[in-house]
Amino acid sequence: MASPAAGLTAPVESVMTSRVVMVLEEIPMAEVRAIVSRYDYNGFPVVSREGRLVGVVTKGDLLRVLKAGLGDPDVWLQPVARWMAHGVLALRPRDSIETAVSLMVDSGLRSLPVIEDDGKVVGIVSRNDLMGAVEGGIGP
């Protein structure tokens, strides 16, 4: 079996999830709440109609909306673009798993979107994906 270090040189595309649940930037937070309930992921890439990454929305963002909604229930009608994180970190498919690990450790994020050069989301990689790669000794 290959050493855990061997898995660090493999490309992110070898461990990423390709079937990504994405959120359109204009949908209301009430719909995001339903999506989060259905899929139970911590974060979701937010995309434009063209599929380009514009942000990420997390369960933490939903908690902020919940707090704001205590005094104003109409806050759930606001678009996700109002509440999401902008300028998010992302990986490219050919980035190494080592790069992904470093970004996650340095940023404290649990997952990172994977995008092509044109900004279109092609996958997502989580801490579990990376741990599986290292434990499994995935290598070139």
Enumerate the language-model features and the residues they cover.
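Tandem CBS (Bateman) regulatory domains
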Residues: 1-19, 58-92, 96-109, 121-140
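A glycine-centered beta-loop-beta connector
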Residues: 36-39, 44-61, 104, 112-129
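Short, basic/aromatic recognition patches
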Residues: 27-34, 101
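Generic detection of intrinsically disordered/low-complexity segments and helix-coil linkers/edges
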Residues: 33-38, 77
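A short beta-loop-alpha structural element at the N-terminal edge
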Residues: 23-26, 92
